[in-house]
């Protein structure tokens, strides 16, 4: 990780260096607890004490949240080493979507694979969608609303909300799917991957980089920018 002034701008090495945390948060001992907005874990959602068991379940989904889970896990473990007696609590982005009905949450793959590997539509940006739905209910002074909420940023998602509950969302097992993102492709025909592998010889690492970093607005603009304002 790179420290620019007191702003952390990269995440390679920072959590192995306690002195950097000390310089940013010089009075760690004054903290009663530390809260994290965490992203993804296999079979775990909601608000959780970040025990080693929960961290292992987060690590089990590193493959589907590679840009998020590894640095989060490293940060949590660094705080634990500095504050061994302080509760560490995580609020998962997937929490708002955890109650989606089966017809929205399940993928049409063999059900035994879904059950064995905890494959389902988890959804993300939950705090954002929940806030929007609550704001709309307060503004309109009613709770019996059917809404489509939109989270727009470097990545984006839509959520169908009925009476304050998420009933469907565009993101799924990973943050890769759904609407087009700045660099991520969003939903595509899965056979594009097989076709590209056969035609170009690209392997899994190259295909992963293509989908995660070279697609979306960046890819469709021919590499001009991942920012719609520039395009």
What are the roles of these predicted feature ranges?
Residues 72, 83-85, 90, 157, ...:
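Non-transmembrane, aqueous-exposed alpha-helical and coiled segments at domain scale
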Residues 1-16, 172:
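Short glycine-rich, Thr/Ser-proximal phosphate-binding strand/loop in the N-terminal lobe
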């Amino acid at each position: 990780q790179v420290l620019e002034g007191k702003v952390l701008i990269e995440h390679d090495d920072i959590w192995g260096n306690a002195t950097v945390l000390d310089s940013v948060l010089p009075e760690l001992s004054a903290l009663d607890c530390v809260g994290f907005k965490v992203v993804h874990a296999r079979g775990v959602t909601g608000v959780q004490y970040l025990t080693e068991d929960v961290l292992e379940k987060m690590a089990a989904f590193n493959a589907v949240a590679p840009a998020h889970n590894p640095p989060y896990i490293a940060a949590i473990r660094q705080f634990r080493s500095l504050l061994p007696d302080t509760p560490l609590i995580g609020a998962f982005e997937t929490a708002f979507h955890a109650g989606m009905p089966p017809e929205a949450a399940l993928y049409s793959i063999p059900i035994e694979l879904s059950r064995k590997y905890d494959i389902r539509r988890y959804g993300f940006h939950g705090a954002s969608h929940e806030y929007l739905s609550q704001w709309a209910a307060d503004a309109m002074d009613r709770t019996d609303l059917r809404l489509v909420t939109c989270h727009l940023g470097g990545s984006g998602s839509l959520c169908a909300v009925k009476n304050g509950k998420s009933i469907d969302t565009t993101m799924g097992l990973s943050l890769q799917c759904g609407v087009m993102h700045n660099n991520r492709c969003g939903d595509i025909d899965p056979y594009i991957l097989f076709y590209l592998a056969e035609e170009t010889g690209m392997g899994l690492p190259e295909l992963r980089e293509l989908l995660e970093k070279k697609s979306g607005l960046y890819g469709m603009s021919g590499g001009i920018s991942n920012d719609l304002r520039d395009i």
